[in-house]
Amino acid sequence: MRALLCSHRLLPLSSLSRTTVKTKSHNPKTLYPNNKPRWESKLHAGPKGFQSSRTSEKPGRPDPDPEDDPPIPQEVFERMMGRIVVSVGTPLGLGVAILKVLEVLKDRNVWDVPLWVPYLTTLVTFGSSALGIAYGSLSTNLDPAKTNSLFGLKEAKENWVEMWKEDQ
C-alpha cells in the first residue's frame, strides 16, 4: 500500500476539476444562535394552586376538629424516631453491605454472581427498609409512662388494632 501511494508524486485526485461549488452549504436564515431557544413557549394556563382555601372547600365536609387527635408527647416522639431509624437503617445498611460483598466476590473471581442475586438482595433489603418506617411508628408504645419491648411486636399488634378502630 505504501509503495502504491508513494509511486506517484501527485495523487490522481488532482485531475478533478477545481471549480468552486456555487451553492451555499448552509442557509443563514435557518441557523439559530445558541443562546436563544428555537421556539418561544408561552404558558396558556394560570396558577391554580394559590387560590384561597375557602373556594376549594367542599360544602358537605365538616371542618376537622383539632382536639380530635391529641399531640404526641415529646418522649414518645423521640422513641418513635429512634425505632424508625433502627428499623430503616438496619436493612438499608445490610443491603448496601451485601451488595459490596457481592461486588468484591465478582471482582476477585471467587464467585461469578448471577445477575438475579443483586436484584433480589436489593428488593428484599431495601423493601424491608421502606416497610421499616411503618413498623417503627407502629411498634412504639404511645404511653409515655410505659417502656417499649425489644422488638415491639406486642405494641405493634395493639397499635394496629387501635389504628383500624379509629378509621371505622
From Swiss-Prot:
It is a multi-pass membrane protein. Keywords: Membrane, Transmembrane, Transmembrane helix. The keyword Lyase does not apply. It is found in: Membrane. GO terms for cellular component: chloroplast; chloroplast thylakoid membrane. Disruption phenotype: No visible phenotype. Its main location: membrane. InterPro entries: PAM68-like. Residues 55-64 have a biased composition (Basic and acidic residues). The chain crosses the membrane at residues 84-104, 113-133. Residues 18-73 are annotated as: Disordered. The keyword Nucleus does not apply. One of its GO terms (biological process) is NADH dehydrogenase complex (plastoquinone) assembly. Has no redundant functions with PAM68. This is Uncharacterized protein PAM68-like.
